[in-house]
């Protein structure tokens, strides 16, 4: 509905209700819109705008932007230029932040980014075309946007993982205490109480698993997409500068490992509770059989 509203304002053809993409010239800017499973992206394209002093959003109605539904996850300004910027220009554009960069596509392009937000609230990327066709340049821009989008989407599970890591400690301690109690069992009543406590622990772990499973699985999938886009870029190093891959390996991979570690802890806890419950049920059954035989 939001896209349709924009189209009506500029008197351009609207997408059909079941459309998942739109590419349209709005006069002062072009818009590429795509709807994905978890998010939608809006790419506003404007030619001949001075780098990072203005952007394509200048031409978009402010009230329309303010009313956009959902939560903002990724905001990036990308400049495509034909002239290689010198160190002074890069320092100015990236506001003194440490920049990662590389030669791309068999040295037909160069890209630079700081992978950080800048004073305008946007991330920044610069791509210098050194021999790409218009189609290839468009594909490069698309891959760079996807790289940043999938990078940030993959990290959405990190706060969940950190919170869950703190919550799993007490559950693991409770299970250890229950296992110790099982070794000290004397009466049938104790066994039944322990089974009930195990059942409550199992329910808590399963609740955590169901609440986090989608987020953790999505994180792995997005991380795979990041690596895929990196491979498609075919990076070659720029002297004295860390590559995009080096930055992502150093900053993104540990976060993904944290998420995978917490997910593995959850799976391990679930299996250990199941095994303990099974052993305890066997003891209860044997105890009941012994009582029946005695009777």
At which residue positions do the language-model features occur?
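Membrane-associated alpha-helical segments
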Residues: 202-295
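Generic detector of well-ordered alpha-helical segments enriched in charged/polar residues
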Residues: 3-8, 58, 62-66, 138-145, ...
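Short, mixed-charge, low-aromatic patches
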Residues: 12-20, 94-97, 122-131, 222-229
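Structural beta-strand/beta-sheet cores of well-ordered domains, especially the beta-sheet scaffolds
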Residues: 38-40, 121-123, 257, 264
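Extended alpha-helical interaction modules
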Residues: 45-203
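N-terminal pre-transmembrane cytosolic regions of membrane proteins
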Residues: 1-82
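Short small/polar-residue motifs
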Residues: 25-30, 107-114, 219
């Amino acid at each position: 509905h939001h896209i349709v509203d924009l189209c009506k304002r500029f008197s351009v053809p609207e997408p059909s209700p079941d459309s998942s993409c739109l590419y349209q010239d709005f006069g002062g800017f072009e818009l590429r819109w795509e709807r994905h499973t978890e998010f939608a992206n809006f790419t506003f394209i404007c030619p001949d705008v001075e780098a990072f002093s203005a952007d394509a959003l200048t031409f978009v109605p402010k009230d329309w932007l303010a009313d956009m539904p959902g939560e903002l996850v990724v905001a990036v300004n990308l400049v495509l230029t034909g002239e290689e910027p010198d160190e002074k220009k890069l320092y100015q554009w990236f506001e003194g932040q440490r920049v990662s960069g590389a030669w791309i596509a068999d040295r037909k392009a160069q890209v630079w980014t700081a992978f950080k937000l800048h004073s305008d609230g946007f991330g920044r990327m610069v791509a210098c075309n050194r021999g790409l066709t218009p189609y290839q340049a468009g594909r490069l821009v698309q891959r760079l946007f996807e790289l940043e989008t999938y990078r940030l989407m993959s990290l959405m599970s990190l706060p969940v993982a950190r919170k869950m890591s703190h919550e799993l400690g007490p559950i693991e301690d409770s299970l250890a205490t229950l296992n110790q109690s099982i070794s000290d069992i004397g009466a049938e009543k104790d066994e039944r109480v322990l089974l009930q406590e195990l059942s409550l622990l199992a329910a808590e772990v399963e609740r955590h698993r169901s609440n986090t499973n989608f987020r953790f699985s999505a994180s792995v999938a997005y991380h795979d997409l990041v690596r895929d886009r990196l491979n498609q870029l075919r990076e070659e190093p720029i002297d004295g500068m860390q590559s995009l891959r080096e930055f992502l390996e150093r900053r993104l991979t540990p976060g993904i490992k944290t998420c995978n570690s917490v997910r593995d802890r959850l799976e391990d806890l679930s299996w250990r509770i199941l095994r303990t419950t099974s052993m305890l049920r066997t003891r209860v059954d044997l105890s009941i059989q012994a009582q029946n035989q005695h009777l």
